[in-house]
Amino acid sequence: ICGGFIALHDAFTRMISAGKMANHPIEEELAAVSVGVVDGEVCLDLPYVEDSTAEVDLNVVMTSSGKFVEVQGTAEDGPFERKSLEEMLDAAAVGITEITEAQRSLLSTPPVERAN
């Protein structure tokens, strides 16, 4: 999702530069992270080893303004408390804020032109 957002932004920027579009349709950045509970602790951006043993596994997609686009999760090892969900969503929001800030910084530079 994060890479797709960058590619889409670059494509729109190129279309504007080529005169095929007048305005950039993207209103804000979009990013996604995985978050879960491993050994009772909330973990952000789970690598495979942690993901494969997580008690709870969530994928969260948010905008840079903190609005949710998607929350998808599974209780892998039995039901979990609402408090755990809130902690995971808070951790996801922190991670997504970092990613969208990096996207904003990256996208402030012109896209790399490729040779045809």
Model-derived regions: residue spans:
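Polyanion-binding surfaces on beta-sheet-dominated domains and ring/shell assemblies
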Residues: 1-116
